Every structure is written in C-alpha cells, then in structure tokens.
Amino acid sequence: MSIREEAENERQKLKNMSWKDRAWYVWEYYKFHLLAVILVIGVLSTIGTMIYRQTFTTRLSVAIINDRSAGASSSALLESELREYMGCGKKDLIEINEGLMVDFNEESTSQYGYATLAKISALVASKSLDVVIGDQSAIDHYETVSAYQNLEELLPPELYERVKDHIYRAKDGEGNLMPVALSLEDTALGEKTGIIMDPPYLAIIQGSPHKEAALQMIEYLFP
C-alpha cells in the first residue's frame, strides 16, 4: 500500500468514527508521534529562549534578605528609577531577588531558610550578585567570611564624604571591624519599596562583576 493509499485509508476510518472515538484512536495510535512533536517544540522553545536571553545584558543584580513586609513590598519603582538613573536600554536588566528569608541561627533555620542560603551561595559562586540589601544579621553573617567590599577603599572620595556617617562596621573572620555596609534608614528606600527592616543595610559583594553599577545605586540612594 502506497503512502497516499494509507493516508486515504486512515481518513476513511476517522470519517466513520464519532468525535470521542476519533480522539481515542488518534491518541492510541499516534501518541508517541504527538509526544515526540511536543518534545521537539519544547526543546526548540528552550533553545530559542536561551538564545534570546543572551541578547540581554545584566547591569546590576541585587538580593534583598529578610524583608519583614510579608510580601507587601514591591521593588518595581526602585527598579524603574534605577534603570532611568543608570541610563539602561531596553535590553539591559536590573535583577532584584526578593523573598529571601533566613534565620542565621542554625538551630532554628527552616527549610526555606536553607533554600535561601543555597540561592545566595549559588549567586555569589557564579558571580551573579552585586549588592545585598539586608538586615544586620545578614550583613554580620556574611562578613564572617569576608563577603563584602571595604567601602573605605572602594568608594570614590566625593561619594565617601556623602555617606560616611551611614557606614556600618561588621566583624570579619578574624574579628576585625570592617566598613562594609551603609545604613539605608535615612534614605527613601522604605518609602519607594515598602521594605520593612530595622534598619536595612546595603553592602557590595567582593566578587561583584558590576561594581560601577553598584556605586551608581549608592549615588541614587544618597542624592
């Protein structure tokens, strides 16, 4: 039987069936073909998304740790104003990782807390994190492994003079007090985002791939 004859035979079979029987027949005899088509479409879609994603450039990546607003906060206005301040184009990304909550006391850390720790570790290890906005416990915890930049060394003189009264010092692994964070208590961060911390601090990660953008964020928050 030729392919044409076989196709005509299948058409006649389906023509004489009810809609329910047709659906059953097609699924029963062609399910592997259909699944293969769906799989191919899924793979092509994933590859296409990856290729398209590569046309974007991450300008800044921020992690917000221990926001106590219970989901009531939003970083949309912060992101929008940062994009404008930094002169971002349509394919420039500012990534703000929200919803990260962890109790750094090992005895009381929840599964969600461990998931947060794992995500932050992955971001740092892959050099995909520039700035942490967190409470005092987040700053203190990560500075024990010298995770943050020394702001007295990093900040340009003019910017340092502007923010020096807001510097927070945390102990590094050797017990030395290091100037690694800025208190954002007197900034408009809370008003713009609804973030609740007492107070929030900003620190720049040692391995930040976008230090200039991180400095621009500080300039934006301390006009």
Specify the residue positions occupied by each region the protein language model found.
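Short, membrane-interfacial amphipathic segments enriched in basic
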Residues: 8-21
